[in-house]
């Protein structure tokens, strides 16, 4: 018997090491605090709201302004464009280690080497169409600009690029040229993701007063006074963009950035929700007589139906403040998929319902997903996914050709293809994985 003791001790040590190294959490895969999250994540759990870890993020911000002739109209007057640019500069200067300004067209030009040198906080008050004429401003190649800016987006750097983002496409074969331009955009962003698997991007569509010349895809000038869209691309490491997203007040589509219309956030993250970020609601958003959750509040012990209803309606509250997704995307029910298809999402909203709020006090601003299924369907479990798609607003903002005409105030030539190029670069890393998913187990129905 004594001869077996060393083997028993050795086995106990091995088991102890396995238990210590592998994180266990109610049978689910967990992610250790501070662990590397740069790879595409699937099965890792979205951090609970109290576990935000972006308080001491070190950021060096570089702000680039496309100063080609097509941008003159935004600075010829005190416009929303100048207001937004000024606010981002001032806030960035407050929350970043350094904030540097550049003009960009055929090359990158440091503002401190121009007539606008000095305190960055005073940059916008001095900016006009004359003193920003640095470099080859006659036209711009947006893919060349992307490449130059992305090549400098390294380490602690976040790049913020202001432009109208209009492809210069000459000739009659518009479709194939746009396709080629989109592929070049995708290539530039794929290179950035290869250099930094933790790379992310925020796209803001903004609106501004405009007084100047609109240049169509052939670079033909059209005098125009009115409202035009422009875009802000914020690019860098995921944790640094999450930090600036909060500090620059970009947290949702109601941000204080003047003229903001839409927002799109892209990364290679894929998360799973658990009891720390999703809870069943029992007193609101339901027509059931009784819902009894499991002790964790996540899975369901049993449902008791009101048999007079043909459909059964129930809901989950989600705490998603650590999710890198705009609120407008989360409240679009077309972005969700439920398996099996007998269950569907019929409402997605940030709740103000007192009963719901009292059940999930741990969530600062709970998103409620309301589900519906036929009373006759009694599935033992169901899986919910937030799909990774291009937001609906992008196709609405796109116009396939602008030759000889100024598009409507919210439309930009080929912007849908440009953003699709960025999206497909990220999709090359995520392989179609959802932004998040969670699975609910139901023990029984009554």
List each model region and its residues.
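Structural alpha-beta junctions
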Residues: 90-100, 183-202, 240
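Extracytoplasmic/secreted cell-surface and envelope-processing proteins
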Residues: 71-75, 109-114, 167-178, 210-216, ...
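Extended non-globular C-terminal regions
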Residues: 279-446
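Acidic, polar low-complexity linker/tail segments
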Residues: 3-10, 14-62, 69-75, 436-446
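Well-ordered, non-membrane alpha-helical segments in soluble/globular domains
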Residues: 76-88, 129-147, 174-192
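Von Willebrand factor
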Residues: 53-163, 167-168, 201-203
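Eukaryote-biased recognition of electropositive, low-complexity segments
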Residues: 195-315
